[in-house]
């Protein structure tokens, strides 16, 4: 409202300037006096036209037709001798007859030439005292100073209006409470001035209007009383100096200039107090200071909800058929599926929490499986999928293809479901109409339509194929997605049966808890293939009739060994030291770490999963030049049937070489170091045996072999 009032006052200022221009034009124009334009004689023998100076015969009577102006201004015409002046208030020579006006611009004058006195005569007219010559114009320097002063006054008034009075009281309070130090100081000085802001605004508007009107009058006089140049010049100067320049300066340094200009604002109010006071009261009544608070409260209540624009635009103009995922692109399960390890692995890799279940054909969706329903399902039980779906019996959510997105979003918000099955009535061809399933629509599809962007997550099976874009490669490599199917192998690959879950747990335990198998030494992929080797997975059958049988002893005191053992199932008895201290251990305890590394002493104690030894984890060089002998100072004996992991020193060294080969780029020089997953490079084993035999005087300890397979990894 304050800006509108300022615009109205500015318009009134221009009207006042135009009125002053008209009044000045009326006062500055001289009164219409008599002026001779031309004359001619009426006799045929005389010249047809003459100038102001003519020649006549003696005693001749002349009849002159005068063309002059100002005949109605009490003027008359007479003939005066050349060189004679015009007496004040009288005539120099009485004409024979006075000039008789015959029109607005014409008059008839009769003269008689005297004989014997040839002389020249001048035709003269009288002008009344009101029609004198115009006053002299002011000097150019005075006009320039006056115009500059008026422009400066208009610019200062406009600048004070834009700087000191532009901030609302609420904005000043916000700056005083939460602004910077400079802003707080400026706000404290401006806050009292906002109390008489209406009077100050009225005073500044009045001064700006007066300055612009006076400038228009001044330029009109300087332009020779020509209105068009005066108006254009005044408008250009006021626009550039009085509007643009204050707006540019105040827009950047408003808070810095406003506190320093408060004195000028008070002076303007004092000079124009009789007019500024009532105008200020009027502006304060029209400003409605509570409007800002009402708008803030409306936004706080949610009246200015930005979602309304989205719902009126995109969501109400598009249907679910525009954003659905076709049925052939959806991840679904058959109702006759058995939940074994491979099926559960595929569900986990899909990354979805809701999976449709169909019967016979994909368009016949009968159930919905939630990922949380599989929390208590064991892969070894091979539970039928129909058993799980009948137990939970999740409802299905169907929508028609012409349903608007805003309606679907409201249903999703109510928690009914975050996945809907889109169907339509197919009445094509002969026969009764039927429902045809087109695809699926999810909450993610609706959100992508709102934000007009693809949501990239770990799975995109339900993403909109119509707007799917190629994923931009990231600068940093993504973390490898866990491939659970690596742990699912054929049953005939093991001599000892090991479940995929136990294989996964063993691989993670060794890579995280045992330093010699950490990813820095042995990669997870190589370790996995090592654990899947038939000679590594072994069983010990406990003989109740002969508890002290030789095959019950995994380690014996002072007997050299070259293998590492991890107990997976069963219990063992450990006897330590000369005192013969005995204790029992169970699953996931391991022994013989020093057998895989460079021996630091002749005897080492057993290592459990709760007590790691850091000083014996440096691996021996792969060339096998050092001794492979390790003599434990403890005895480990089975107390029940055991399932264990047994890794020999040669197998461990081959795993180190395979890991090193994976980290090297492929080239002819390192071709011998290439390790193929799931197979064995015989060259590595042969070279290791040859090197060990050449550096050790006694034969190396043989490595377990299985038919058709090589002994290492």
UniProtKB/Swiss-Prot annotation:
Bilayer topology annotation: Multi-pass membrane protein
TM stretches of this protein: 7-29, 137-157, 199-219, 227-247, 267-287
InterPro entries: ACDP, CBS_dom, CBS_dom_sf, CNNM, Ion_transp-like_CBS
Sugar-bearing residue positions: 73
Tissue-wise expression: Widely expressed with highest levels in brain, kidney, liver, lung and heart.
Annotated compartments: Cell membrane
Pfam families hit by this protein: CBS
Keywords per UniProt: CBS domain, Cell membrane, Glycoprotein, Ion transport, Membrane, Phosphoprotein, Repeat, Transmembrane, Transmembrane helix, Transport
Superkingdom of origin organism: Eukaryota
UniProt keyword Manganese present: no
Stretches the record annotates as Disordered: 664-713
GO cellular component: plasma membrane
Residue ranges constituting the CNNM transmembrane domain according to the UniProt record: 136-314
Biological process per Gene Ontology, one example term: monoatomic ion transport
The CBS domain, residue ranges: 324-385, 392-458
Stated role: Probable metal transporter.
Family statement drawn from the similarity comment of this UniProt entry: Belongs to the ACDP family.
Protein name listed in UniProt: Metal transporter CNNM3
Organism whose genome encodes this protein: Mus musculus (Mouse)
Lineage, opening ranks: Eukaryota, Metazoa, Chordata, Craniata, Vertebrata
